[in-house]
Amino acid sequence: MEKATNNLTQKLTGIAWIAFACFIGAALVTYDPADPLPSPMPPLDRIYQPDQLVEPVNAAANNACGLVGAVSADLLLVFMGFGAHLLVATLIWLGWKRLKSISSGSPRIQMAGWILTLLGACGLSSLVIPHWSAGPVIGAGGYIGALEVAVLRQHFALTGAAIVLSSCFIAGVLLFVDETILEP
């Protein structure tokens, strides 16, 4: 009986991850820079202030997920840029693993790999396509990518920064998906 309950819990958790990914994905796809965004409550207003990038501002949020979706999409794009889409793919993958009852052998290593992958994706977005952004002024990699590129270009120049970020991304993917190159 306990195994059946545990299996049901895993499947429901998988469905919840996939539903959350669909919500975030729909919010990102229907992101509109003209959506009116409220100011966050203190103390969150010290780390995030929504920027109205266009005039005139819409009367109501046009995001498919409403005001919550508009705020979520803006927050993710400002901090992670295109890394937010990586977050959606990750949530779908985690949900699928839960639905199939596939357990991960080393969740800490996978988390470290995901963080490396996210850092590499945000940094590469800021380095390679800096002005190709759906909305935030900071650029395609968000604040995370802009910070990485500023530090890496100062110490490694353009080519070195690209090599470091690419290596970070590839190593992170290998750690996250729990695979190795040498495995037959």
What is each PLM-predicted segment?
Residues 1-184:
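Alpha-helical transmembrane segments used as membrane anchors
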